[in-house]
Amino acid sequence: MKTIYPFMGLALCSVTAQAQEKPNFLIIQCDHLTQRVVGAYGQTQGCTLPIDEVASIGVIFSNAYVGCPLSQPSRAALWSGMMPHQTNVRSNSSEPINPRIPENVPTLGSLFSENGYEAVHFGKTHDMGSLRGFKHKEPVAKPFTDPEFPVNNDSFLDVGTCEDAVAYLSNPPEEPFICIADFQNPHNICGFVGANEGVHTDRPISGTLPELPANFNVEDWSNIPKPVQYICCSHRRMTQASHWNEENYRHYIAAFQHYTKMVSKQVDSVLNALYSTPAGKNTTVI
Protein backbone atom coordinates (compact mmCIF):
# COMPACT_ATOMS: atom_id res chain seq x y z
CA MET A 1 0.00 0.00 0.00
CA LYS A 2 1.25 3.44 -0.88
CA THR A 3 1.17 6.57 1.25
CA ILE A 4 -2.40 7.64 1.92
CA TYR A 5 -3.62 11.21 1.94
CA PRO A 6 -7.05 11.93 3.45
CA PHE A 7 -7.88 15.58 2.78
CA MET A 8 -10.44 17.86 1.13
CA GLY A 9 -8.49 18.86 -1.96
CA LEU A 10 -6.57 17.47 -4.90
CA ALA A 11 -3.97 18.87 -7.27
CA LEU A 12 -4.10 17.92 -10.93
CA CYS A 13 -1.11 15.93 -12.12
CA SER A 14 0.18 14.47 -15.35
CA VAL A 15 1.30 10.88 -15.51
CA THR A 16 4.40 9.96 -17.50
CA ALA A 17 5.63 6.70 -15.95
CA GLN A 18 5.47 3.42 -17.81
CA ALA A 19 2.28 1.38 -17.38
CA GLN A 20 3.84 -1.21 -15.07
CA GLU A 21 5.15 1.56 -12.81
CA LYS A 22 2.00 3.63 -12.61
CA PRO A 23 0.24 3.64 -9.25
CA ASN A 24 -3.52 3.36 -8.94
CA PHE A 25 -5.53 6.08 -7.21
CA LEU A 26 -8.67 5.82 -5.10
CA ILE A 27 -10.38 9.09 -4.18
CA ILE A 28 -13.11 8.93 -1.53
CA GLN A 29 -15.36 11.94 -1.05
CA CYS A 30 -17.92 12.44 1.73
CA ASP A 31 -20.16 15.41 1.02
CA HIS A 32 -20.64 17.78 3.96
CA LEU A 33 -18.00 16.08 6.12
CA THR A 34 -16.25 18.34 8.62
CA GLN A 35 -13.06 17.75 10.57
CA ARG A 36 -15.08 18.53 13.73
CA VAL A 37 -16.26 14.90 13.74
CA VAL A 38 -13.09 13.26 12.41
CA GLY A 39 -11.05 11.44 15.03
CA ALA A 40 -7.81 12.09 13.17
CA TYR A 41 -8.31 15.77 13.99
CA GLY A 42 -8.70 15.10 17.71
CA GLN A 43 -12.43 14.43 17.96
CA THR A 44 -13.54 11.68 20.34
CA GLN A 45 -17.05 10.72 19.17
CA GLY A 46 -15.82 7.64 17.30
CA CYS A 47 -17.65 8.61 14.12
CA THR A 48 -14.87 7.98 11.60
CA LEU A 49 -12.85 4.97 12.74
CA PRO A 50 -11.98 3.68 9.21
CA ILE A 51 -10.95 7.18 8.13
CA ASP A 52 -8.90 7.58 11.30
CA GLU A 53 -7.09 4.31 10.59
CA VAL A 54 -6.19 5.55 7.11
CA ALA A 55 -4.98 8.84 8.54
CA SER A 56 -2.80 7.09 11.11
CA ILE A 57 -0.57 5.68 8.35
CA GLY A 58 -0.80 8.63 5.98
CA VAL A 59 -0.72 12.40 5.85
CA ILE A 60 -3.41 14.83 7.00
CA PHE A 61 -3.76 18.54 6.35
CA SER A 62 -4.67 21.04 9.07
CA ASN A 63 -4.92 24.16 6.92
CA ALA A 64 -6.69 23.16 3.70
CA TYR A 65 -9.84 24.74 2.27
CA VAL A 66 -12.36 23.99 -0.45
CA GLY A 67 -12.59 26.24 -3.49
CA CYS A 68 -16.01 27.51 -2.44
CA PRO A 69 -18.39 26.81 0.48
CA LEU A 70 -21.03 25.56 -1.98
CA SER A 71 -21.28 22.08 -3.46
CA GLN A 72 -21.24 22.63 -7.21
CA PRO A 73 -18.65 25.44 -7.39
CA SER A 74 -16.41 23.49 -5.02
CA ARG A 75 -16.67 20.29 -7.06
CA ALA A 76 -16.07 22.11 -10.34
CA ALA A 77 -12.95 23.66 -8.79
CA LEU A 78 -11.73 20.34 -7.41
CA TRP A 79 -11.96 18.38 -10.67
CA SER A 80 -10.78 21.19 -12.96
CA GLY A 81 -8.10 22.79 -10.78
CA MET A 82 -9.66 26.21 -11.43
CA MET A 83 -11.29 28.57 -8.95
CA PRO A 84 -15.00 29.51 -9.29
CA HIS A 85 -14.20 32.94 -10.71
CA GLN A 86 -12.33 31.12 -13.50
CA THR A 87 -14.91 28.40 -14.19
CA ASN A 88 -17.85 30.82 -13.71
CA VAL A 89 -19.57 28.03 -11.78
CA ARG A 90 -20.56 30.21 -8.84
CA SER A 91 -23.69 28.57 -7.40
CA ASN A 92 -25.62 25.31 -7.21
CA SER A 93 -27.90 26.32 -10.10
CA SER A 94 -27.86 24.56 -13.46
CA GLU A 95 -27.56 26.07 -16.94
CA PRO A 96 -27.90 28.78 -18.11
CA ILE A 97 -27.12 30.43 -14.76
CA ASN A 98 -23.90 28.42 -14.52
CA PRO A 99 -22.01 27.37 -17.66
CA ARG A 100 -20.57 23.91 -18.15
CA ILE A 101 -16.79 23.54 -18.01
CA PRO A 102 -15.52 24.12 -21.60
CA GLU A 103 -14.28 21.09 -23.53
CA ASN A 104 -10.84 22.68 -23.97
CA VAL A 105 -10.25 22.90 -20.20
CA PRO A 106 -8.17 19.95 -18.91
CA THR A 107 -9.82 18.05 -16.07
CA LEU A 108 -8.55 15.42 -13.68
CA GLY A 109 -10.38 12.75 -15.65
CA SER A 110 -9.13 13.88 -19.04
CA LEU A 111 -5.51 14.06 -17.88
CA PHE A 112 -5.55 10.55 -16.46
CA SER A 113 -7.59 8.93 -19.24
CA GLU A 114 -5.27 10.43 -21.86
CA ASN A 115 -2.28 8.94 -20.06
CA GLY A 116 -3.21 5.28 -19.97
CA TYR A 117 -5.53 5.18 -16.96
CA GLU A 118 -9.02 3.79 -16.65
CA ALA A 119 -10.85 6.67 -14.99
CA VAL A 120 -14.11 5.71 -13.26
CA HIS A 121 -16.51 7.61 -11.03
CA PHE A 122 -19.23 6.27 -8.77
CA GLY A 123 -21.76 8.38 -6.89
CA LYS A 124 -22.57 12.06 -6.67
CA THR A 125 -21.67 14.32 -9.59
CA HIS A 126 -23.01 17.93 -9.29
CA ASP A 127 -19.98 19.00 -11.29
CA MET A 128 -21.08 21.05 -14.36
CA GLY A 129 -18.92 18.96 -16.67
CA SER A 130 -15.74 18.97 -14.59
CA LEU A 131 -15.82 15.17 -14.30
CA ARG A 132 -15.23 14.89 -18.04
CA GLY A 133 -12.85 12.02 -18.75
CA PHE A 134 -14.32 9.76 -16.08
CA LYS A 135 -16.67 6.90 -16.92
CA HIS A 136 -19.55 7.63 -14.58
CA LYS A 137 -21.96 5.03 -13.22
CA GLU A 138 -25.14 6.51 -11.80
CA PRO A 139 -25.97 4.89 -8.45
CA VAL A 140 -29.30 3.16 -7.91
CA ALA A 141 -31.08 4.37 -4.78
CA LYS A 142 -31.74 1.59 -2.25
CA PRO A 143 -34.46 2.81 0.17
CA PHE A 144 -34.40 1.73 3.82
CA THR A 145 -35.73 2.97 7.14
CA ASP A 146 -33.95 4.15 10.27
CA PRO A 147 -35.56 3.87 13.72
CA GLU A 148 -34.08 7.09 15.10
CA PHE A 149 -33.23 9.53 12.31
CA PRO A 150 -34.94 10.52 9.05
CA VAL A 151 -33.22 9.20 5.93
CA ASN A 152 -33.72 10.39 2.38
CA ASN A 153 -32.30 9.93 -1.10
CA ASP A 154 -28.84 11.04 0.06
CA SER A 155 -28.55 7.91 2.19
CA PHE A 156 -30.39 5.70 -0.31
CA LEU A 157 -28.01 6.63 -3.13
CA ASP A 158 -24.96 5.98 -0.95
CA VAL A 159 -25.96 2.32 -0.67
CA GLY A 160 -25.79 2.04 -4.47
CA THR A 161 -22.55 4.01 -4.67
CA CYS A 162 -20.92 1.72 -2.11
CA GLU A 163 -22.06 -1.42 -3.94
CA ASP A 164 -20.75 -0.11 -7.28
CA ALA A 165 -17.35 0.92 -5.89
CA VAL A 166 -16.93 -2.35 -3.99
CA ALA A 167 -17.77 -4.38 -7.10
CA TYR A 168 -15.22 -2.46 -9.19
CA LEU A 169 -12.39 -2.60 -6.65
CA SER A 170 -13.00 -6.28 -5.95
CA ASN A 171 -12.28 -7.02 -9.61
CA PRO A 172 -9.99 -4.20 -10.80
CA PRO A 173 -8.78 -3.83 -14.39
CA GLU A 174 -5.31 -4.88 -15.47
CA GLU A 175 -4.43 -1.34 -16.55
CA PRO A 176 -3.80 1.36 -13.93
CA PHE A 177 -6.93 3.05 -12.66
CA ILE A 178 -8.17 6.14 -10.89
CA CYS A 179 -11.44 5.48 -9.09
CA ILE A 180 -13.68 7.97 -7.29
CA ALA A 181 -16.19 6.82 -4.68
CA ASP A 182 -18.31 9.96 -4.26
CA PHE A 183 -20.65 9.66 -1.27
CA GLN A 184 -23.53 11.96 -0.34
CA ASN A 185 -23.41 11.63 3.43
CA PRO A 186 -23.33 13.20 5.92
CA HIS A 187 -25.32 15.51 3.59
CA ASN A 188 -28.54 13.86 4.84
CA ILE A 189 -28.27 16.35 7.71
CA CYS A 190 -29.88 18.91 5.40
CA GLY A 191 -32.92 16.67 5.09
CA PHE A 192 -32.93 16.31 8.88
CA VAL A 193 -33.26 20.08 9.21
CA GLY A 194 -36.13 20.18 6.72
CA ALA A 195 -37.92 17.32 8.46
CA ASN A 196 -37.69 19.20 11.77
CA GLU A 197 -38.53 22.71 10.61
CA GLY A 198 -39.62 25.24 13.22
CA VAL A 199 -40.79 24.56 16.75
CA HIS A 200 -40.88 20.80 17.34
CA THR A 201 -40.23 17.94 19.73
CA ASP A 202 -37.46 15.62 18.57
CA ARG A 203 -37.86 11.88 18.21
CA PRO A 204 -36.24 10.11 21.20
CA ILE A 205 -32.89 8.50 20.45
CA SER A 206 -30.76 5.93 22.22
CA GLY A 207 -27.71 7.11 24.10
CA THR A 208 -26.78 10.50 25.49
CA LEU A 209 -27.26 13.68 23.50
CA PRO A 210 -24.03 15.49 22.56
CA GLU A 211 -23.24 18.74 24.32
CA LEU A 212 -23.46 22.05 22.49
CA PRO A 213 -20.18 23.59 21.29
CA ALA A 214 -18.52 26.26 23.39
CA ASN A 215 -19.34 28.96 20.83
CA PHE A 216 -23.07 28.13 20.63
CA ASN A 217 -24.16 31.34 22.38
CA VAL A 218 -22.92 34.57 20.81
CA GLU A 219 -22.49 37.36 23.35
CA ASP A 220 -21.39 40.13 20.99
CA TRP A 221 -22.75 39.95 17.44
CA SER A 222 -20.80 43.07 16.46
CA ASN A 223 -17.62 40.98 16.46
CA ILE A 224 -19.12 38.41 14.09
CA PRO A 225 -18.39 38.86 10.35
CA LYS A 226 -21.33 40.31 8.42
CA PRO A 227 -21.83 37.22 6.22
CA VAL A 228 -22.22 35.08 9.35
CA GLN A 229 -24.60 37.60 10.94
CA TYR A 230 -26.92 37.45 7.95
CA ILE A 231 -26.59 33.77 7.04
CA CYS A 232 -30.03 33.15 8.55
CA CYS A 233 -31.50 34.99 5.58
CA SER A 234 -29.31 33.42 2.88
CA HIS A 235 -30.22 29.72 3.04
CA ARG A 236 -33.53 27.99 3.67
CA ARG A 237 -32.00 25.49 6.07
CA MET A 238 -30.96 28.28 8.45
CA THR A 239 -34.48 29.71 8.29
CA GLN A 240 -35.97 26.28 9.00
CA ALA A 241 -33.84 26.01 12.15
CA SER A 242 -34.31 29.61 13.29
CA HIS A 243 -36.83 28.70 16.03
CA TRP A 244 -35.02 25.68 17.43
CA ASN A 245 -34.17 25.43 21.11
CA GLU A 246 -30.95 24.09 22.61
CA GLU A 247 -32.23 20.51 22.81
CA ASN A 248 -33.18 20.64 19.12
CA TYR A 249 -29.61 21.59 18.27
CA ARG A 250 -28.23 18.76 20.40
CA HIS A 251 -30.38 16.36 18.39
CA TYR A 252 -28.99 18.00 15.24
CA ILE A 253 -25.43 17.22 16.34
CA ALA A 254 -26.44 13.64 17.18
CA ALA A 255 -27.97 13.28 13.71
CA PHE A 256 -24.83 14.62 12.04
CA GLN A 257 -22.71 12.12 13.93
CA HIS A 258 -25.15 9.35 12.94
CA TYR A 259 -24.98 10.14 9.21
CA THR A 260 -21.19 10.37 9.47
CA LYS A 261 -21.02 6.91 11.04
CA MET A 262 -23.22 5.56 8.24
CA VAL A 263 -20.91 6.76 5.49
CA SER A 264 -17.83 5.78 7.50
CA LYS A 265 -19.00 2.15 7.41
CA GLN A 266 -19.34 2.43 3.63
CA VAL A 267 -15.84 3.88 3.38
CA ASP A 268 -14.65 0.84 5.33
CA SER A 269 -16.35 -1.48 2.81
CA VAL A 270 -14.68 0.32 -0.10
CA LEU A 271 -11.24 0.11 1.52
CA ASN A 272 -11.68 -3.57 2.33
CA ALA A 273 -12.56 -4.23 -1.30
CA LEU A 274 -9.46 -2.35 -2.45
CA TYR A 275 -7.13 -4.30 -0.17
CA SER A 276 -8.71 -7.64 -1.09
CA THR A 277 -6.71 -7.73 -4.35
CA PRO A 278 -3.02 -7.19 -5.21
CA ALA A 279 -3.95 -3.85 -6.81
CA GLY A 280 -4.44 -2.42 -3.34
CA LYS A 281 -0.70 -2.63 -2.68
CA ASN A 282 -0.07 -0.19 -5.52
CA THR A 283 -2.89 2.24 -4.77
CA THR A 284 -2.72 5.71 -3.27
CA VAL A 285 -5.86 6.57 -1.31
CA ILE A 286 -6.99 10.19 -1.09
Go through each PLM region and give its residues.
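Pocket-flanking alpha-helical
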Residues: 70-78
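Short beta-strand segments
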Residues: 27-30, 63-65, 123, 178-185, ...
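Catalytic-site neighborhoods of secreted/periplasmic enzymes
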Residues: 77-179, 183-205
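Active-site-proximal N-terminal segment of extracellular/periplasmic enzymes that hydrolyze or transfer
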Residues: 20-59
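Alpha-helical packing segments of well-folded alpha/beta enzyme cores
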Residues: 29, 50, 104, 108, ...
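Hydrophobic h-region of N-terminal signal peptides that target proteins for export
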Residues: 9-18
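Sec-dependent signal peptide recognition
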Residues: 2-9
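Active-site-proximal cap/lid insertion segments
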Residues: 32-45, 171-175, 183-286
